[in-house]
Amino acid sequence: MMVRPTILIDMRKHRIRIHKHTLQAIGDPDFVMLIINPIEYTLGIKYGLPDDKLALRIRKSTLRNDYELYSTPLMAALHQLCPEWKERENYRLEGELIATENMAVFSMRDYTVVEH
């Protein structure tokens, strides 16, 4: 059985933690892109290319169990889209893999609150 792609959204630390198995599922990229669809309330993590200005570099030398991305503006945008998310909570999202696109998609309506 394959493990579902998983991310953790930490509103308090303004962080998205992308689990290592999620990165492996989308092709173990050196760069990723985050895609937010506000109409469908989804967040996508896609294999990125180095020449794409929106791609974020994954530093493999520091990668252990997950990749952490810190962004106050991104968290503010997510909070605006999901006002029920509290600023001091952590949210685990399990998504679906779209293998043909090297992408994982997460519904922001389907989450679990994680205790600190």
Task: Describe the predicted segments one by one.
Residues 10, 26-28, 98-100:
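Solvent-exposed loop and beta-edge segments used for protein-protein assembly and interaction
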Residues 15-27, 70-78:
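Short beta-strand-centered segments at strand-helix junctions
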